[in-house]
Amino acid sequence: MKDLLKLLKPTNQAEEFDGIRIALSSPDMIRSWSYGEVKKPETINYRTFKPERDGLFCARIFGPVKDYECLCGKYKRLKHRGVICEKCGVEVTLTKVRRERMGHIELASPVAHIWFLKSLPSRIGLMLDMTLRDIERVLYFESYVVTEGGLTSLEQGQILTEDEYLDALEEHGDEFDAKMGAEAVLDLLRAVDIDGDVQKLREELPETNSETKRKKISKRLKLLEAFQVSNNKPEWMILKVLPILPPDLRPLVPLDGGRFATSDLNDLYRRVINRNNRLKRLLDLAAPDIIVRNEKRMLQEAVDALLDNGRRGRAITGSNKRPLKSLADMIKGKQGRFRQNLLGKRVDYSGRSVITVGPKLRLHQCGLPKKMALELFKPFIYGKLERRGLATTIKAAKKMVERETAEVWDVLDEVIKEHPVLLNRAPTLHRLGIQAFEPVLIEGKAIQLHPLVCAAYNADFDGDQMAVHLPLTLEAQLEARALMMSTNNVLSPASGDPIIVPSQDVVLGLYYMTKEKINGKGEGMVFKDPNEAEKAYRTGQVELHSRVRVRITDTTIDDDGNRTTKTELRDTTCGRAILSLIMPEGLPFELINQAMGKKPIGRMLNKAYRDLGLKDTVVFADQIMYTGFHYAMVSGASVGINDMVIPEAKKEIVSAAEEEVAEIQEQFESGLVTAGEKYNKVIDIWSTANEKVSKAMMDNLSKEIVKNKDGEDEEQASFNSVFMMADSGARGSPAQIRQLAGMRGLMAKPDGSIIETPIVANFREGLNVLQYFISTHGARKGLADTALKTANSGYLTRRLVDVSQDVVIMEEDCGTYEGLYMKPLIEGGDVVEPLRERVLGRVLCEPVMKPGSEEELLPRNTLLDEKMCDVLEENSIDEVKVRSVITCDTDFGVCAHCYGRDLARGHMVNQGEAVGVIAAQSIGEPGTQLTMRTFHIGGAASRATAENNIQVKNPGTIKLHNAKWVVNSDKAHVITSRSTELTLTDEYGRERERYKVPYGAVLKKGEGDSVDGGETVANWDPHTHPIITEVEGRIKFVDLIDGVTMTRQTDELTGLSSIVVLETGQRTSAGKDMRPMVKLVDGKGNDVNIAGTDIPAQYFLPGNAIINLEDNSEVKIGDTLARIPQEGSKTRDITGGLPRVADLFEARKPKEPAILAEKTGTVSFGKETKGKRRLLITPTDGGDQHEEMIPKWRQLNVFEGEQVTKGEVIADGPEAPHDILRLRGVSAVANYIVNEVQEVYRLQGVKINDKHIETIVRQMLRKALILRAGDTNLLEGEMVEMSEVLAANAKAEADGKKPAIFERQLLGITKASLSTESFISAASFQETTRVLTEAAVGGKKDSLRGLKENVIVGRLIPAGTGYSYHKERMQRRLDELNVDIEPTMTAEQAEQQLADALNAGNSSAGDDSAE
């Protein structure tokens, strides 16, 4: 019995460990792992296939080849367990030990570990403070290094060439030591005094001034401290003993025909052993130095190749000319251990097949072919057959199943009942790519899928395949049913809108049945209820579309569940009455009393979910689908060539356009317009022509004139099939119909420019050869784009998941009072996103007050649902402060209140929800729909003329924000501030429109004036930038000398002369240092001050400024003194689509970014250099002056003497997110990234909730840079996790010490993933070698907090249902630590016990942890 128990023991090793530590292993440690030294390069005997003794597969070292059998066959059987055979020396045990027993090689000469040498920055190099090149020259025997200087002039670590060494030998004899090779480096590493060096460097750091030196010191300090903390010894970076992988992990398999298939590692090990043995022999023979050296170098190279082939020099190749796969290659990359086997595994109990439509299924069902079911449920069937007594043994059951007897099918039916299966379609881009269904057995071999879940899977039935998985355990079945059932996933986790929305045929059917027709059969009939209407339709008394009156009963259910009914006669159509029969009670008839396109159906389902709950919605969705299919069939909608009606007006429009083009061509030939202007005009003409044709076509298609019952003509919505499909949203769009029946329009050349002659034909008329050829380019580009897009989008998703995977809801409420202010998003005259959309499902951070009173509408910590949003709208509230993940205070995760509503469920989010992964999937999944290209501004795109006025759309009141203005002589306001915004508010004070107003704009209306819709409120000259005077007086020119700093120009047409200031480059040497300016003086010639200050009114003039006034002329307030011409800003390519999203999340700095003011203060210009000017800001609060060099070609927005606030734009351009964070703070950068990302998705019509993007931004803001360390143990210039900084500061403040000063850093997602605390997660993401090297040197411990690390070590993840498991485990650990201590002990004893308990915990972790 004991033996049996022992047998079971090794398999059941407890996985109770709390972390995994990675460290350098010492030679002794490697020897302790080993079961013996491998002395020979032989593998197995080619005749007997038995492993050679002392070879790479030796049974004595690694264990027996057959279970419980020694090699020579003396001991067989279980009874000899643990005996070591005296003849062949093999222990009698399981073969399995050959997977875990390691061997070793004693190296004849030490060898450097290539990872610590070559992985940048070189750890050995940093340790010794030598360059990598020098160390390599020593290691590969090209030069000597001094290991012991003695009393000579030679320094330790000095590099000597062969000749220098010989000279030194002559001079000093044996007073010094110099060696080459790894021994030398080993001696140097041994000599490093870590504690002393750390002390020295810490003292040096504050005293060094040069930036580079400080960086170098802090790098070295970090490394030394890592060694100090981790108890690694530097000399362990040099190998003296090489471990050998267990043989079953590098198998050698005999193939038929006497050949062997082998792992590359065996070849690499053989090289090492061969060279090592040869070196041993040479040393024994006392061979000449040069030969020994060469052999040592070869050994070093062999070990390098084994550890990381190709890292240094050329990769060693095998017989077939491909590089051998080394140990490093085994773990990195997509095919490496991490990503291939640990993060993604193949599973059993699965099958795959093609999918087809299951229009008769319920939403929670799927059709499973009998063959597949039989195979998947085999074990269940065997068990059931035995329990029934139909089969006596498993074998008999197996026979029955193979014969497929009748009982087997009966049993299968029972087994399948209520046992959900999982269906998955690749690529699984979001969590709805795997859902659970109840199987229904079907004939045939294809899986049947419910049409409504196709949208979630992004599946269609053109040959897609899906995989079926079977949840086995009870818990798995329970989770599948409660969490993954398709009926539980009605809402999309990305936007919170229903994702189970009918499309295509169903939409067409519903649209058809709810259309109305004038003068249909039975028009004007009256029915007592919808049932009667249906009877009349079925008996042919009434047409489906006829306008009739029906008595309809509406039921409304309020919050408490009370029902109120209302019955009245309604004007409707027969079809709508029939549709109302399947409406669940509680939904108003209004919802369907219209032509039901895709959008109204979506709204209806959304309302059903919010008002009636999940169950009714699911039943309703199914009913809608069945009805839709039926009436789509009845409608007989089909497409014939005659349905594509070409508008009459097309000929005229096209010929008119051709005439215009001919006219422009004439103008071009006579030299009136340039080629560029001609090109733009021609393209303009054709674009408008195309618009006209398509408008004419749609008008023609969408309406038809019919006779009504009085015989008069009346127009109604058309019943044209093509139009119905597009109008209902079932398939197609006006743009596509335009190509079928309008004209194809302008096409692009391969270089992206637009061809001047459009394709005038459409598909109905047919294309000629040239037209066809032109259009092939676009089509091919589309295909190439799609392929690229898929890969790029997948990679973006992977980076997003990796950065956000450990964001999990950890607690209910972190109690923070921080949050983000939310306003409606307004661009120009349009509300892009109303407040309601932005705050729905968020939690309030501050109570909302009723406008104009002290009354509290909604208290703090309210979750805003639909009803609350109605309250906000009724009280016309414009700005709300809500909680956000970005400002959440929870360490290691976020709290439920800061996240708000779980979008996929519609209630407050649960603890343990993996919101990070959901966010990443929601952003990544639509990635394939985004465009790939950057738009080149050319042709039709650059038609937008420069804006020169603001015309409001709605009536309302004007408000100006951060504006300064003066009133000029015409009583108009002239703006004299930079970043002014003008908003229009309605009568409730809600913002409706928002515009930017430039400096120098003239406002007809001022602050608080009311305007009518369509009124123009501001004008400015878009081509010049004025300089406005804020005081009146006479002007006086200073340093304006004709021919030195300015020239006069006379306009040919008007004869007026103007003064143009020369740029510094064009001036003579005399004028280089002059500063031309205009001063204002009063009648007596004294300087005038700007009102309310003692700053004299003087305006410096930059180069190219134009002055139309003469010296000493009078000016009034608000007059223009000078104008600076604005050259049209360089046409930049607009980056759009996927690359733009990637740029934002990677926080890339744009080319030529906007320059922002670093401080608040007064601007002045210092001495200029050749290509740059010096901008100085003198702070208002009297701090240090800030200076910045700005290239001259940048157009500046500020003049000398102007006030700027911190973060204000000084030179236009795309803003860099890092600058925004530094100068305007966290919420500004969050807003910027959220809005910019949303803009890209909005263009494609994809709806994503803001909080997903915020979750990613939170992860990008995880790190802080330490500016001053204070009294904490942080290093300045170091990047540290925010939570760590806050903890250190809290500790310092509690002890009354100085806290550290830090600044938040914004990291791109790749960099953020690589700098996570967990090295396992980082290593499995990218740059595996670098991450592992760094972690090993620092002796890092991974405490397995995130999801990825736990998947890799094979545990439940700390999210979802695994969250409670981890919580309980933590609690148990705490209890265990608290239980052992009896209060009777002394303090010392207690401490000892606690230490023992902790050590016991650690040592048990040590056994399992991967050292």
UniProtKB/Swiss-Prot annotation:
One of its GO terms (cellular component) is DNA-directed RNA polymerase complex. Binds 1 Mg(2+) ion per subunit. Its cofactor is Mg(2+); Zn(2+). InterPro entries: DNA-dir_RpoC_beta_prime (IPR045867), DNA-dir_RpoC_beta_prime_bact (IPR012754), RNA_pol_asu (IPR000722), RNA_pol_N (IPR006592), RNA_pol_Rpb1_1 (IPR007080), RNA_pol_Rpb1_3 (IPR007066), RNA_pol_Rpb1_3_sf (IPR042102), RNA_pol_Rpb1_4 (IPR007083). The keyword Transport does not apply. Keywords: DNA-directed RNA polymerase, Magnesium, Metal-binding, Nucleotidyltransferase, Transcription, Transferase, Zinc. Its EC number is 2.7.7.6. The keyword Transferase applies. Mg(2+) binds at residues 460, 462, 464. Disulfide bonds: none annotated. Pfam families: RNA_pol_Rpb1_1 (PF04997), RNA_pol_Rpb1_2 (PF00623), RNA_pol_Rpb1_3 (PF04983), RNA_pol_Rpb1_4 (PF05000), RNA_pol_Rpb1_5 (PF04998). Zn(2+) 2 binds at residues 814, 888, 895, 898. It catalyses: RNA(n) + a ribonucleoside 5'-triphosphate = RNA(n+1) + diphosphate. GO terms for biological process: DNA-templated transcription. GO terms for molecular function: DNA binding; DNA-directed RNA polymerase activity; magnesium ion binding; zinc ion binding. The RNAP catalytic core consists of 2 alpha, 1 beta, 1 beta' and 1 omega subunit. When a sigma factor is associated with the core the holoenzyme is formed, which can initiate transcription. DNA-dependent RNA polymerase catalyzes the transcription of DNA into RNA using the four ribonucleoside triphosphates as substrates. Belongs to the RNA polymerase beta' chain family. This is DNA-directed RNA polymerase subunit beta'. The gene is rpoC.
